[in-house]
Design a protein with these regions (language model features):
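Short, solvent-exposed micro-motifs at the edges of structured domains
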Residues: 1-227
Length: 227
């Protein structure tokens, strides 16, 4: 078994050379780069990862049912393994769907990468979050035309990530050099919903809502002939 825990804090004024969806193309105000200082887009404060491989103690050469009977042959060679990952969410920035500061850099031609931010008053965080209302949308307002919003960069946290992947393997020796392996693999074993970032564009009909999630549970089976 292996386990690791990471606590981190990363701060910058630009996390990517090329923008991706939800990331700014340019600073909101090129003459005030200090206002861009905030948590990095990739900053994950806490991450715990545990992995294991365990040979089941049944069958020939094992603690239990080690004779040459039918049960021994059936239960010999089983192995289970898995990876458990728990982490907090990464930060995101609330942005405007339309440019109001007349700087000409508010939104990209592709419709994402908005770098104009709204005004914020009060606490935008919520004590009880849900996919329908991930943060306090009432805390954000449009700034007056011709001015920059006072909301900071990456001031909110997105959903965390909780995932368990596991496998069950049966190895059967066919000869001294040949082995038949059956595999059952489970991705997101408990079908835990891992949500994507909420809609962060003020003015969008779904502003503040989580509208998509990562992959649900997948199960796959396979047979390998190893020689």
């Amino acid at each position: 078994m292996l386990a690791s825990y990471t606590w981190s804090k990363s701060i910058d004024d630009a996390s990517n050379f090329f923008p991706s969806a939800g990331d700014p193309n340019y600073p909101q105000n090129s003459y005030d780069l200090r206002s861009e200082r905030g948590r990095s887009n990739f900053d994950v404060a806490h991450r715990l990862s545990v992995s294991y491989v365990y040979d089941l103690p049944f069958g020939k050469g094992r603690t239990y049912l080690g004779d040459d009977g039918a049960w021994s042959k059936l239960l010999t060679g089983w192995q289970t393994s898995g990876i458990v990952t728990l982490q907090t969410g990464r930060p995101f920035t609330v942005a405007l769907l339309r440019e109001l500061d007349n700087s000409g850099t508010g939104i990209s031609a592709l419709g994402f990468g908005a770098n104009d931010r709204p005004n914020v008053a009060g606490d935008p965080s919520l004590g009880q979050r849900s996919p329908e209302r991930w943060f306090n949308t009432a805390a954000f307002t449009f700034p007056p035309r011709g001015s920059f919003g006072n909301a900071g960069r990456n001031i909110l946290d997105g959903p965390g990530y909780h995932n368990v992947n596991a496998s069950l393997v049966k190895n059967t020796a066919l000869s001294e050099t040949m082995n038949l392996q059956f595999r059952a693999e489970f991705f997101n074993l408990f079908n835990h919903p891992n949500f994507n970032l909420p809609d962060n564009f003020l003015g969008s009909p779904s502003f503040g809502q989580v509208t998509s999630a990562r992959e649900p549970r997948h199960i796959q089976f396979g047979v390998k002939l190893l020689f």
